[in-house]
From Swiss-Prot:
GO BP: axon guidance; locomotory behavior; neuron differentiation; neuron fate specification; positive regulation of transcription by RNA polymerase II; regulation of backward locomotion; regulation of forward locomotion; regulation of transcription by RNA polymerase II
Pfam families: zf-C4 (PF00105)
Record organism: Caenorhabditis elegans
GO molecular function: DNA-binding transcription factor activity; DNA-binding transcription factor activity, RNA polymerase II-specific; nuclear receptor activity; RNA polymerase II cis-regulatory region sequence-specific DNA binding; sequence-specific DNA binding; zinc ion binding
Stored InterPro entries: NHR-like_dom_sf (IPR035500), Nuclear_hormone_rcpt_NR2 (IPR050274), Znf_hrmn_rcpt (IPR001628), Znf_NHR/GATA (IPR013088)
Region Disordered, annotated ranges: 211-238
Protein name in UniProt: Nuclear hormone receptor family member fax-1
Superkingdom as given in the UniProt entry: Eukaryota
UniProt keyword annotations, A-Z: Cell projection, Cytoplasm, DNA-binding, Metal-binding, Nucleus, Receptor, Transcription, Transcription regulation, Zinc, Zinc-finger
Amino acid sequence: MSDEDEPLNFSTSKATEESKEGILGVRSIFNTPLLFPPPMFNAGVISPHIAAALAMSFNQQRMNASVSPPLDHTTISVNSFPSMGSVKTDSPPTASSPTLCCAVCGDVSSGKHYGILACNGCSGFFKRSVRRRLIYRCQAGTGNCVVDKAHRNQCQACRLKKCLNKGMNKDAVQNERQPRNTATIRPALDMDPQNFFREYAGAVSAIMGHSNMMKREDSPSSASDGKTEDEKKDSLQETTMSQLESVLQWAQQFRLFTVLTNSEKRQIILTQWPRLLCISLCEQAEDVSFDDHLTSLMLKFRRLDVSPAEFNCLKAITIFMKRELSLWRAGWDNRASIITVYPAGERGARLVAAALLLAEHSVMGFGNCVIPLALVFSTKSRYVIQRHAINSLPACVPGGTSAHPVLRCSMGSRREKVI
């Protein structure tokens, strides 16, 4: 026996036959799990091979025990859960049940959606959450809110959590396809005033770096036929709240907005949220039934054929079109400049263009930009969108338990005027 095979303890007898069999088993350590028979430890000796194997086994167990930190149950997104191949989910109701119920909220199921029986409301909510990579925070702060037919819209975080726990497969949600009528390659742009807005919008999209490419349906209510009134109401509430949160998140990521002071940001949001919500709804509304006034406004945008990059341009201009603010162009050309943005009008739009493109683009006229801006900034449009927000989001009206801070501050003194 060589020196490296000598036992570590010379005060006891040789290893038993069972120990020898255990030592032979160590040779397969890299192919199978390491198992040590109990008689091995009664022999009073341990070989260096076994010592090394034990150390490796304990190290492997410690690595397996070092799992990721527990989920924050108050903040939920689809990325909070692993893929379906590595997670055990609650068993959804089988299709042989006499009454097909949604596994998430218990409403009547329209069939299997993303792997489980679900209603149109929950399947649509799950699809939007996955496609837009939305992050929700539990309203109650517990992560255990009741999710049923009557309360499914009260806490989006707990609803998404239950969708995933019940077995909805986020990998089954397909990426959105661009509509055929906008998928064609556009010809090269010249400096004609009619084409300048599209060229400018592309530059703004590049500056912002996060153009939202959500699809737009031909008609905002064309896909809502066949839905029950409850489903239409749920879809309306979800879409409105989702678009409001989405456009506010967009503003927080807009680089020219982030350099403003907190008081300036607050004043902009309180003043411009109806217009920003209007643009967002016109851009991203899906199979939702709106009232006649808002539907008419959205159809006007459809006829203008506004592209996603142009919608981003409109949102950027809308932020700075109402009040006199000091707009810092920080970090461009290694210096900071102050540009004063004047109230709404073509002159204000030109100045916003200068603020966005001064670093590397020439300041030019807006051309077709004035038309959609006039729609968004009209007094009628503001009241229409405020009335829509109040009617579709009753829980956010002042006095509600889950009042949205933006709506609570901005609609509190205007509700009597717009209803």
